[in-house]
UniProtKB/Swiss-Prot annotation:
InterPro entries: Ankyrin_rpt (IPR002110), Ankyrin_rpt-contain_sf (IPR036770)
Gene3D superfamilies given in the database record: Ankyrin repeat-containing domain
One Pfam match: Ank_2
Record's keyword terms, sorted: ANK repeat, Repeat
The protein's name in its UniProt record: Putative ankyrin repeat protein L797
Source organism of this protein record: Acanthamoeba polyphaga mimivirus
């Protein structure tokens, strides 16, 4: 081919290419490829290189002929590679210095396992809606910061760009997302991969309570730990009360340890599709968060509160009451180890456990004080507890008889006959009044 090339003038070769409408001839020889500099409109050549996956030609052009194609050659190739779904070429171009921001704003969508939405099967690259387009039938794309509002049960994250230069492109803006009739799908990432979340956080995704619960449901422990670390480093809309309620131990302990009283909350407004920030300065209510941790069975948070903020967590009998009400055996064991009397309040704890059908806890308390069997026998009219001790699986909890209401039992704990007890500095419990803590020797040292 080289011999033939030199036998004919360049102008004739150009005429052959144009009249045959076959630009493939440009790619058969380096000499022919050099003719590109004589062609004014180079877009069809770029399109051909990308569409036909002429990867070696692309690499050669980047290395030796980039000036021939103009200043935006890399970005033109990048755009074409995204449109054609040649995503590995797009990655290569970005690695070589192509400006990814030339694609416009980055958006996200999440997809299911089949990547099918409203009977439309997504493909890499350009996706064009067929048929009537309106606000309900188009492709929904989201800003990175709000994508976590739309995780649902999806398993993949997709990069999305809007092909604004395409003929016929249309879009609507609704709340905080767009609806378009054309989108360009980039790389697919799995939502159970840690690197996916690092990528999302890098692009500004806001961590919400729903995000952490999504990762918990999918048993993504490393991702949960990473997200909590991110929350410790930056302020988001998960405060200490939510952390204690949901058992975000690392985050809750961070708040407690550092006595964070100024929390920055980013509020999300669905109707406007916006966030705004509100700095709230307030004293942490340690008694309240101790109760939240107890109600929801988060023993590590409670332990840290009791042992590090002992002067603030309040009456341990109230905490024991909540542990019995919600049936958290490990917390009850912990409180018993501290020295909490299980017979206080006219045996309110025993009755409360009976009412909640927590026979497993009553069985444990028998090892602490065998005399409570007399209380149990008084309410065990049909011998349900005896049956449980013989065969726990034989009991139907719907048959229990509850002699007292929770309100009645709570009154016993709050009555003068049950003097409040608190965890003291010397790792013990005592019955001093809460207001007397400032008088404890060495308390303010």
């Amino acid at each position: 081919m080289s011999d033939i090339y030199y036998q004919l003038p360049v102008e004739i070769w150009l005429q052959i290419i144009f009249f045959s409408d076959n630009i493939n001839l440009l790619f058969v020889d380096k000499n022919f490829f050099g003719l590109i500099k004589l062609i004014n409109d180079k877009k069809p050549i770029i399109k051909k290189i990308i569409n036909q996956n002429y990867f070696d030609v692309l690499r050669y052009a980047i290395k030796n002929c980039i000036g021939i194609f103009g200043d935006n050659f890399m970005e033109d190739c990048l755009r074409q590679s995204f449109y054609d779904g040649q995503l590995y070429i797009a990655d290569y171009l970005v690695d070589k210095g192509a400006d990814i921001y030339s694609m416009g704003n980055l958006y996200f969508i999440t997809t299911n396992e089949t990547e099918n939405h409203n009977n439309f099967r997504y493909v890499d690259g350009l996706n064009v809606l067929q048929g009537k387009f309106n606000k309900k039938t188009g492709f929904y794309v989201h800003k990175p910061e709000t994508i976590c509002q739309y995780l649902n049960h999806n398993i993949y994250l997709r990069d999305v760009y809007l092909p604004k230069g395409k003929t016929g492109f249309k879009k609507f803006k609704l709340e905080n997302y767009y609806v378009a009739n054309m989108i360009v799908l980039g790389k697919q990432r799995n939502l159970i991969d840690l690197d996916t979340w690092k990528y999302m956080i890098y692009h500004g995704t806001i961590i919400t309570e729903g995000v952490i619960e999504y990762c918990r449901i999918n048993k993504c422990t490393k991702i949960v730990d990473y997200l909590l670390d991110c929350l410790i480093e930056t302020n988001h809309n998960i405060d200490i009360y939510t952390a204690c309620k949901n058992g975000y131990t690392k985050l809750a302990i961070h708040y407690i340890k550092n006595s964070i009283i100024c929390r920055e909350i980013r509020y999300y407004i669905m109707s406007r599709g916006t966030y705004w920030t509100d700095n709230k300065s307030e004293n942490i209510n340690h008694e309240h968060i101790a109760n939240l941790a107890t109600q929801n069975g988060h023993i590590e948070i409670l332990k840290y509160l009791v042992e590090e903020k002992y002067e603030l967590v309040g009456n341990l009998y109230i905490i024991m009451f909540l542990a019995c009400q919600y049936g958290h055996l490990e917390i009850i064991k912990y409180l018993v180890e501290l020295g909490v009397d299980i017979r206080q309040g006219l045996d309110a704890f025993i009755y409360l456990l009976w009412q909640g059908s927590y026979f497993n806890i009553l069985k444990y308390l028998l090892t602490v004080d065998s005399d409570i069997i007399n209380i149990i026998n008084k309410v065990d009219y049909n011998g349900w507890f005896k049956m449980y001790l013989k065969d726990p699986l034989s009991i139907d909890s719907n048959h229990y008889i509850h002699p007292y209401t929770i309100s009645e039992l709570k009154c016993r704990i709050n009555s003068p006959i049950c003097k409040p007890i608190y965890y003291l500095r010397n790792k013990s419990i005592g019955t001093i009044d809460f207001d007397d803590f400032n008088d404890i020797d060495g308390f303010n040292d």
